[in-house]
């Protein structure tokens, strides 16, 4: 098994490139004497229109009619607003309220899995922003026989046209009885706790944009059955994401046609919590958003807002990843959804071992990631 392969069969998926606009057809130029006055007049009219338009529509960002992504607003948060956003995060709440209840054995179909699912549902329903929480229960055939699974889907404003979707899996890998317990702290209790802390910390800000009926809303997916139950393969892995992507592809959504098309950006978190993680951009289509995360990390470092974070330990790195990784983004990627995959590569040393516990997490790294992601959300959603 080579580093970064996650012990799973490699499968290269071509990232859908953006179509280049057709070139304008050439037209005969007017004679120079007639052309210059007309050019000056056109420039004057264009400038006047631009001034009037911006006075009526301040800060409006032009959106593509295709599924292209928006251009990120570099440095769109003032330092005061950035500090305000970061100040809403509570490391003790993240760790004690959200992370520790997840650190139990929770493979699909187990009592621990159901306990965590109910905890996620109750936590999301308690937020003052008024999230729309849906359960996606289903039964699937597995190498262990039929098992019950359940995804948790939370959408801030179901009526919004587009979704920024953050996702992680909440199940832990199944190990046969008699082996040491596996609680999957990095895989993926910490990602789940990060999402809960983010929406709790930004609750008031998210409530405001919901009341304003913003065109882009936040959506969270807590997916079940990511791990293989026996041996990784197309039928023994990604149970929850495969089921949910298929369901979302069939549910109508305005302006349409379905919920899967409403996902403007799918951000998947996995294998987080060990010290000095390294992240790479996995898809050219979302490289601009990866660059945004790099810029945010550098800015927070310059402002001395990251802990145990020397200049030489930058999480978000340029260059190519060690190799493709199959994860819960695959069913969505295959349906044309833009994916930003935030997975530590190489994988943590404790990956798929009983040592993937709270004791081997690095709290400063977890809190640093919460700050980077909080600023990213605030910029993307215009909080």
UniProtKB/Swiss-Prot annotation:
Gene3D superfamilies: Zn peptidases. SUPFAM superfamilies: Zn-dependent exopeptidases. Its EC number is 2.3.2.5. It is an enzyme of class 2 (transferase). One of its GO terms (cellular component) is Golgi apparatus. Pfam families: Peptidase_M28. It comes from the Eukaryota. Belongs to the glutaminyl-peptide cyclotransferase family. This is Glutaminyl-peptide cyclotransferase-like protein. It is found in: Golgi apparatus membrane. InterPro entries: M28_QC, Peptidase_M28, QC/QCL. Keywords: Acyltransferase, Disulfide bond, Golgi apparatus, Membrane, Metal-binding, Transferase, Transmembrane, Transmembrane helix, Zinc. Detected in thalamus, hippocampus, brain cortex, cerebellum, kidney, lung and liver, and at low levels in heart and spleen. The keyword Transferase applies. It comes from Mus musculus. Its main location: Golgi. Responsible for the biosynthesis of pyroglutamyl peptides. GO terms for molecular function: glutaminyl-peptide cyclotransferase activity; zinc ion binding. The active site is at 226 (proton acceptor), 270 (proton acceptor). The chain crosses the membrane at residues 33-53.
């Amino acid at each position: 098994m080579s580093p970064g392969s996650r012990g799973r069969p490699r499968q290269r998926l071509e990232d859908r490139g953006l179509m280049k606009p057709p070139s304008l057809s050439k037209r005969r130029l007017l004679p120079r004497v007639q052309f210059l006055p007309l050019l000056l007049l056109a420039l004057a009219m264009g400038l006047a229109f631009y001034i009037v338009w911006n006075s009526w529509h301040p800060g409006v960002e032009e959106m593509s009619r295709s599924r292209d992504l928006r251009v990120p607003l570099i440095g769109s948060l003032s330092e005061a607003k950035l500090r305000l956003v970061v100040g809403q995060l509570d490391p003790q709440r993240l760790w004690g309220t959200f992370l520790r209840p997840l650190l139990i054995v929770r493979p699909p179909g187990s009592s621990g899995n159901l306990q965590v699912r109910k905890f996620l549902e109750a936590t999301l329903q308690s937020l003052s922003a008024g999230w729309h929480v849906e359960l996606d229960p289903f039964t699937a055939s597995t190498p262990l026989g039929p098992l019950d699974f359940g995804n948790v889907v939370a959408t801030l404003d179901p009526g919004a046209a587009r979704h920024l979707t953050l996702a992680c899996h909440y199940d832990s890998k199944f190990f046969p009885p008699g082996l040491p317990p596996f609680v999957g702290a990095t895989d993926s209790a910490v990602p789940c706790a990060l999402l809960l802390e983010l929406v709790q910390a930004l609750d008031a800000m998210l409530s405001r944009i919901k009341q304003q009926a913003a065109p882009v809303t936040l959506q969270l997916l807590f997916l079940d059955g990511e791990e293989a139950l026996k041996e990784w393969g197309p039928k023994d892995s990604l149970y929850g994401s495969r089921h949910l992507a298929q369901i979302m592809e069939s549910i109508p959504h305005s302006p349409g046609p379905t919920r899967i098309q409403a996902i403007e950006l799918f951000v998947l978190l996995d294998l987080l919590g060990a010290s000095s993680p390294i992240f790479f951009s996995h898809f050219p289509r979302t490289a601009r958003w990866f660059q945004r995360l790099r810029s945010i990390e550098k800015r927070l470092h310059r402002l001395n807002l990251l802990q145990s974070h020397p200049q030489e330990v930058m999480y978000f790195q340029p260059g190519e990843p060690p190799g493709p990784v199959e994860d819960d983004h695959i069913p969505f990627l295959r349906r044309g959804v833009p994916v930003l995959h935030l997975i530590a590569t190489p994988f943590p040393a404790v990956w798929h071992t009983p040592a993937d516990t709270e004791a081997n997490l690095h709290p400063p790294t977890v809190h640093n990631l919460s700050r980077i992601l909080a600023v990213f959300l605030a910029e993307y959603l215009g909080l």
